[in-house]
């Protein structure tokens, strides 16, 4: 049987109730998913962050918070910059 039930992999706890808990949820999801990226380019990191946070927004995960669309845009921008800094390729220096 190749069918996968999405509900088996969803968190069944309460949705975030404050801006802070929403940001923690976003950060945890983005950080965990970024570890599985084979190609950690700026484009792939940006796409990953947009997809995850957009899906959480569409899934009404932030309805109990006071987050605005502007807040979410700023959060995405910060996450993108931070992850790009973490995963940027360093030049090999002679030893």
Question: Locations of the language-model features?
Answer:
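Terminal helices and disordered tails flanking the catalytic cores of nucleotide-processing hydrolases
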Residues: 1-95
């Amino acid at each position: 049987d190749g069918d996968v039930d999405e509900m088996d992999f969803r968190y069944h706890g309460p949705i975030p109730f404050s801006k802070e808990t929403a940001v923690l949820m976003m950060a945890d999801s983005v950080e965990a998913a970024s570890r599985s990226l084979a190609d950690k380019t700026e484009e792939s990191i940006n796409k990953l962050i947009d997809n995850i946070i957009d899906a959480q927004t569409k899934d009404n995960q932030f309805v109990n918070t006071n987050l605005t669309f502007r807040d979410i845009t700023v959060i995405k921008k910060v996450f993108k910059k931070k992850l790009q800094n973490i995963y940027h390729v360093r030049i090999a220096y002679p030893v």
